[in-house]
Design a protein with these regions (language model features):
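Helix-loop-helix "hairpin" substructures at the membrane interface of multi-pass membrane proteins
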Residues: 13, 135-202
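Alpha-helical transmembrane segments in multi-pass membrane proteins
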Residues: 17-21, 41, 45-49, 63, ...
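Alpha-helical transmembrane segments within multi-pass membrane transporters and channels
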Residues: 24, 57-101, 108
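Alpha-helical transmembrane segments of polytopic integral membrane proteins
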Residues: 24-30, 49, 74-80, 101, ...
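Short loop-to-helix capping motifs
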Residues: 35, 59, 173-175
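Transmembrane helix-bundle core of multi-pass membrane transporters
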Residues: 85-86, 91-161, 188
């Protein structure tokens, strides 16, 4: 039973890493750049949920929606201001800019929220599942795994069966050829950042 418990915990933690990796890989695969600020966007999403629940006393659903909106807007803003002017810049310039954006977000969070540690509230209050004798699975673990599976299926369907998804694949394969075929490269990259940042909030 201990093995199954560890296995489920590992899958749950791996699901979190998978969601984080989705945002990274989408941006890298399409924009061909490492967005080092992605982790900081995740941090901002966490602070938004914490503030909404602890200070504004909103429900978990409202807090999560607020985090998704804030992270999406933040991701698109970062892309427009910091990365778009560097489309044809050397990789080192993009790398330095990405690190700079990361430090900027970290220090802004430090300025706004302070450096004191906080306990993240249990916003969902999901019951534990007693699967068998000696084997209990937390509701959060089940929700994390289920949400990751649903998001991956939805994202795969979006990429393979929508016009924007086809544009993303085209830009990923050959940006110049995609532009010649009428694909708006800038808009496609902005949508990619929006999706990646929304995933960061989740």
């Amino acid at each position: 039973m201990n093995f199954l418990s560890y296995l489920i915990s590992g899958i749950s933690l791996g699901s979190v890493y998978a969601l984080i990796a989705l945002g990274y890989t989408m941006v890298y695969g399409i924009a061909k750049m490492l967005n080092f600020a992605h982790g900081d966007v995740i941090m901002i999403g966490g602070f938004v949920i914490f503030t909404a629940v602890s200070s504004m006393h909103t429900s978990a659903g409202v807090a999560i929606v607020c985090a998704i909106i804030v992270c999406t807007v933040l991701g698109v803003t970062i892309e427009k201001i910091a990365y778009k002017p560097l489309r044809n810049a050397p990789p080192l310039a993009v790398l330095i800019t990405a690190i700079g954006v990361s430090y900027f977000l970290q220090n802004m969070a430090l300025l706004i929220f302070g450096s004191a540690s906080r306990n993240f509230p249990d916003i969902l209050n999901l019951p534990d599942w007693h699967v068998a004798e000696g084997l209990t699975v937390t509701g959060e673990a089940i929700l994390t795994i289920a949400a990751t599976i649903v998001i991956m299926i939805a994202l795969t369907a979006f990429i393979n069966h929508t016009r924007i998804g086809s544009a993303m694949q085209a830009v990923s394969e050959d940006r110049g050829a995609a532009q010649l075929m009428g694909v708006n490269v800038n808009s496609t990259i902005s949508v990619t950042f929006a999706i990646g940042s929304a995933l960061a909030a989740v």
